[in-house]
Every structure is written in C-alpha cells, then in structure tokens.
Regions:
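Flexible, low-complexity linker and terminal segments
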Residues: 1-166
Length: 166
C-alpha cells in the first residue's frame, strides 16, 4: 500500500483517486474478505454438481426454499448441492469463489435487484477451461428466459421454483 494511504482526499485529482481504487483498494478489500471469511460455503456436498450463490436477504430466501422443499444438509450432500453465502458482494473475492465453483456443472445466482454477484462471477469464471466451466444462471436461464426477476422482491416460493426447474 502507498505510504500516504489509499483513501480519497482533497486536493487529489480524480485520476489519482481512481488509480488508488484500481491499484490498491479493490485488492485490499478482496483480501479483507478472504482473510476474514466473509464469503463461505454454507452447505456442501462431497460430489457437488449444482451450486447456489447468494447474498443478503436472498440467502434467507434460499435457505427457506430449501427447507420448504425438504432439502436438509444430508439431502443436499446426497444430491450434489453446494450453497455459497456471500457476505461482501463487491468486490467479489475470487479465490474462495473459485473453490466454491470447483466441480460444479451449474451455478444459480440468487440476488435481489441488480446483478452485482452474477456479473462478477461470470467474469471470474470466463477463463476456466470450457469443460470445467460451470454454466451460470440467475436473472435469466441458459437460453435467456426469465428465471429470477430483478424488478420484484424475491420470495422463498420464487426461489424454490427456480431451484426445482434445474
């Protein structure tokens, strides 16, 4: 980190502030998330194939949807389900995200409003070898049909329907 810190301050020019953001602050924030375990696997399986990545209130909706569907931790392990709880959605810490995605065939991103996590996740997985890259769905499915709307509040029932469709 620079000796004078990373914070925005007067009379720094906007380009100097942007340089600090892109050269230091984003990497420091990602490392903070990694070291403090802000993003974590909440449910795991020994042979995962389907993952759900979620953040905020949507995490509670996912957990309620799974409970409503009768998917307990042992059932999740048996059917190959992995759930990843994101505590800090931006910037999305890539190392733990890659560990989560390892071995998955498909990832369902469940988040409300804007696609903050989904956009970062697809960017982080883009350079995976094609055979190892999981399909990412969320607001839309793999052929562009609406799956989880970003214009309405998600409910456990909506999330359950999205999960069941997979």
């Amino acid at each position: 980190l620079p000796a004078d810190g990373v914070h925005g301050r007067w009379p720094d020019k906007p380009l100097e502030q942007e340089l600090r953001l892109n050269k230091y602050k984003i990497y420091a924030a990602r490392e903070f998330a990694r070291v403090n375990g802000l993003n974590r696997i909440a449910i795991d399986s020994p042979n995962p194939r389907f993952g759900i990545i979620t953040t905020g209130k949507a995490y509670l909706d996912v957990m309620q949807a799974l409970e409503d569907m009768g998917i307990t931790g042992s059932v999740a392990a048996e059917i190959g389900l992995r759930v990843y709880k994101v505590g800090m959605p931006w910037p999305l810490e890539p190392r733990a995200t890659h560990e989560f995605a390892e071995g998955l065939e498909e990832i369902l991103v469940v988040e409300e409003k804007r696609s903050i996590v989904e956009d970062q996740l697809t960017g982080q997985l883009y350079n995976y070898p094609v055979a190892a890259r999981p399909r990412v769905i969320g607001e839309f499915d793999e052929i562009g049909r609406d799956l989880l709307p970003n214009l309405a509040e998600l409910t456990p029932a909506m999330v359950a329907l999205a999960i069941a469709s997979r």
